[in-house]
């Protein structure tokens, strides 16, 4: 599918072109991706941005774990250290009992159901007792019960009837409404130990009370007990990556966080180890760029150390701190990981940058498909766009019938045990680079007498010594110009441990007349085989070529037919000493390599394989 594109070149020209098939493949291990993420973190201020106030709540509502456990009970007003009731209030029943008891001071329950006031010596049956404080006796129930009409005087040491049973019965010491019963002096609601009492739930020292400040439901057991949390130090994380075949990567960042804060009982110094884990999917956006996208992010806390009151009572707030940090750190650190991955995505996007190829053209890499993720490596397929400064794309192979299929990218060799990255460049791509140079005329050269000291004199006398008819036509020595042109694109053939460049050139021998008129003596076709070697300097692939052999064919001659073989040594020397240095000079600008994930190929091992050049680091 042809997709039009147009980008501005760094030179004055613009480069417009079309997408090609995959010509370059990059494989990287998890270590390369991990190093890229680590380098991004070190160079950016993403983690330093976390050194700030920790947002404990939003709109006054603290982070909590109420979705796990039930919310704390609601009290009447909650003003008195978490107590159930207002200041000075206790819970009573239908009378003004003391400390929550059901009956008045000094009253006991007799066996016949009547209430006896031990503060007085006279007794009255329940049916004649005045109700609610008007007499010494009153009924223990709403309806009158059958009672005694007469009660005798007690002998010395005698226990009144009903006292023993009343101690354990309703209203007794331990019975219902008694001192220790559910509604009595100690255990009843509002009693000493009961709910809302001194030690009861919501009481002065109970849950939510003074001691409840440090307990479940108290002030310190909620986030309100810790305020002013601020991250003061965040170490650069240790990054580890695990490849998830067909998905992406599993990212783990281990860091240490130092946090300061305040509590009701002193300042807090918190040190916590955090392991941030994220499942990251590798996708492609609509523009065709790969993107690392977080699917899930979690934080695992460990090694929490809390210094409170110079070491006092640290265990009381450990669970609270753990719960608070478990709630707030994911919302604080996971977005930072997302920012870091965004910067890594930007690095992936740098591949698409237009890079000058000398002053004559440019190279641009683009992604051709969704990267492949295996258990061993991440594979990126790249297109290469080689453009001329004049605006045309080099669509290799030029001059070939359109029905011929393009050469497919060969299979890459397995990665070695000590290999972290592998860049494979096809012969097709190298041919495109040389084709761009050929179309710009960079390989054409005019060689004149005296230009190269190692060459013999380029005159009619030198040529006439080999071709007598030249001497006959030009008895006086005249200077010659050897005009070498490359009319067709060179081709690159890669074989095992051998890179061959075939260049077809024409060599026109021109003589200069006294009146500056040039006359062609002959035109020779020269087929040359060049041996190429490769190296890496910086971020560029350097190509150096040397002449292997030449083959000549006489196309035209103005001095009659002659055996072109007699010129083979001279032509080969001209190509070796003049043409090859000129060609290596234009190749000296190097071929830009893809800039991706901070990979350094400067010390790469280079292997020439069948139709493939492989750089391994």
Swiss-Prot record:
Paired cysteines (S-S): 297-334
GO CC, alphabetical: cytoplasm; extracellular region
GO molecular function, one term: lipid binding
Disordered: annotated span: 117-142
Subcellular location: Secreted; Cytoplasm
The entry's keywords: Cytoplasm, Disulfide bond, Glycoprotein, Secreted, Signal
Gene3D superfamilies: Bactericidal permeability-increasing protein, domain 1, Bactericidal permeability-increasing protein, domain 2
Glycan attachment points: 275
Annotated signal peptide: 1-17
Keyword field contains Disulfide bond: yes
InterPro entries tied to this protein: Bactericidal_perm-incr_a/b_dom (IPR017943), BPI_fold-BPI/LBP (IPR051660), Lipid-bd_serum_glycop_C (IPR001124), Lipid-bd_serum_glycop_N (IPR017942)
Pfam families: LBP_BPI_CETP (PF01273), LBP_BPI_CETP_C (PF02886)
Its biological purpose: May have the capacity to recognize and bind specific classes of odorants. May act as a carrier molecule, transporting odorants across the mucus layer to access receptor sites. May serve as a primary defense mechanism by recognizing and removing potentially harmful odorants or pathogenic microorganisms from the mucosa or clearing excess odorant from mucus to enable new odorant stimuli to be received.
Family the entry assigns: Belongs to the BPI/LBP/Plunc superfamily. BPI/LBP family.
Protein name: BPI fold-containing family B member 4
Organism: Mus musculus (Mouse)
Gene (name only): Bpifb4
């Amino acid at each position: 599918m042809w997709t039009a594109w147009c980008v501005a070149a760094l030179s004055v020209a613009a480069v417009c072109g079309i997408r090609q098939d995959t010509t370059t493949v990059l494989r990287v291990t998890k270590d390369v991706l991990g190093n890229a993420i680590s380098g991004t973190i070190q160079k950016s201020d993403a983690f330093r941005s976390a050194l700030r106030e920790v947002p404990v709540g939003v709109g006054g509502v603290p982070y909590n774990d109420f979705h796990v456990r039930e919310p704390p009970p609601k009290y009447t007003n909650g003003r008195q250290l978490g107590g159930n009731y207002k200041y000075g209030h206790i819970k009573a029943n239908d009378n003004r009992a003391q400390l929550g008891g059901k009956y008045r001071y000094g009253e006991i329950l007799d066996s016949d159901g009547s209430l006896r006031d031990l503060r007085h010596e006279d007794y009255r049956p329940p049916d004649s007792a005045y109700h609610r404080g008007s007499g010494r006796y009153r009924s223990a129930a709403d309806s009158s019960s059958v009672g005694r009409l007469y009660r005798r005087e007690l002998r010395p040491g005698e226990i009144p009837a009903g006292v023993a049973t009343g101690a354990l019965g309703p209203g007794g010491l331990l019975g219902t409404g008694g001192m220790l019963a559910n509604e009595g002096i100690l255990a009843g609601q509002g009693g000493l130990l009961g709910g809302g009492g001194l030690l009861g739930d919501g009481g002065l020292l109970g849950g939510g009370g003074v001691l409840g400040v440090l307990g479940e439901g108290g002030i310190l057991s909620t986030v309100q007990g810790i305020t002013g949390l601020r991250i003061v130090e965040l170490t650069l994380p240790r990054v580890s990556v695990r490849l998830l075949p067909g998905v992406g990567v599993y990212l783990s960042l281990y860091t240490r966080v130092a946090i300061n804060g305040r509590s009701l009982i002193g300042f807090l110094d918190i040190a916590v180890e955090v392991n941030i884990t994220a499942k990251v999917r590798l996708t492609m956006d609509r523009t065709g760029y790969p993107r690392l996208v977080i699917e899930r992010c979690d934080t695992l806390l460990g090694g929490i150390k809390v210094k409170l009151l110079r070491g006092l009572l640290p265990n009381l707030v450990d669970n609270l701190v753990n719960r608070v940090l478990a709630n707030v750190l994911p919302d604080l650190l996971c977005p930072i990981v997302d920012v870091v991955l965004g910067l890594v995505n930007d690095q992936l996007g740098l591949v698409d940058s237009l890079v000058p190829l000398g002053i004559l053209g440019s190279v641009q890499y683009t992604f051709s498909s969704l990267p492949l993720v295996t258990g061993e490596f991440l594979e990126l397929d790249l297109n290469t766009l080689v453009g001329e400064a004049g605006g045309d794309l080099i669509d290799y192979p030029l001059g070939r019938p359109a029905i011929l299929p393009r050469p497919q990218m060969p299979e890459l060799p397995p990665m070695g045990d000590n290999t972290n990255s592998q860049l494979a460049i096809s012969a097709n791509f190298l041919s495109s680079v040389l084709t761009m140079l050929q179309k710009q005329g960079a390989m054409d050269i005019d060689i004149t007498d005296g230009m190269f000291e190692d060459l013999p004199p380029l005159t009619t006398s030198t040529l006439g010594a080999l071709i007598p008819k030249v001497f006959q036509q030009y008895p006086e020595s005249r200077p010659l110009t050897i005009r070498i042109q490359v009319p067709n694109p060179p081709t690159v053939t890669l074989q095992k441990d051998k890179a061959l460049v075939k260049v077809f050139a024409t060599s026109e021998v021109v003589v200069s007349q006294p009146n500056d008129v040039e006359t062609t003596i002959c035109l020779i076709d020269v087929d040359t085989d060049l041996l190429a070697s490769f190296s890496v300097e910086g971020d560029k692939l350097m190509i150096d070529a040397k002449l292997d052999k030449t083959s000549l064919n006489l196309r035209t001659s103005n001095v009659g037919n002659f055996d072109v073989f007699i010129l083979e040594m001279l032509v080969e020397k001209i190509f070796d000493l003049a043409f090859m240095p000129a060609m290596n000079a234009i190749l000296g600008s190097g071929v830009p390599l893809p800039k991706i994930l901070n990979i350094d190929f400067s010390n790469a091992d280079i292997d020439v394989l069948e139709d493939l050049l492989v750089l391994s680091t």
